[in-house]
């Protein structure tokens, strides 16, 4: 998985413009996490894609957007995964490396789960 971290304007319409670049280039986003960050009036947007060439294409396009202040491709050692899975005992939160979290989800045979990658 290839993870892109962006610092963007924290205002309406920015996510649509960012995702428009993925749509125009027919790049599927596997996970997306967005939230306030350390920079006032900015948000961090973290997206993951499967294909490295697609990630590099997206990076080139995203850097041209006025709403994007910083864009970087995060190496695997800078990534972490988290998930929420539904079990017979209730919901369970998981945090760890992507492969580790995916393995736990698979072993749990949970009918419902959500997983995302994050990075700084």
Show the residue positions of the predicted features.
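Long, contiguous binding/interaction regions
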Residues: 1-42, 50-120
């Amino acid at each position: 998985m290839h993870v892109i971290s962006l610092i963007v304007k924290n205002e309406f319409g920015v996510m649509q413009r960012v995702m428009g670049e993925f749509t125009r280039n027919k790049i599927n986003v596997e996970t997306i996490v967005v939230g306030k960050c350390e920079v006032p009036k900015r948000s961090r947007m973290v997206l993951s894609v499967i294909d490295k060439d697609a990630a590099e294409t997206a990076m080139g396009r995203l850097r041209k957007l006025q709403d994007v202040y910083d864009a970087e491709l995060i190496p695997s050692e800078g990534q972490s995964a988290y998930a929420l899975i539904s079990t017979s005992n209730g919901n369970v939160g998981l945090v760890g490396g992507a492969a580790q979290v995916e393995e736990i989800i698979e072993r749990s045979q949970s009918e419902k789960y959500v997983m995302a990658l994050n990075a700084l």
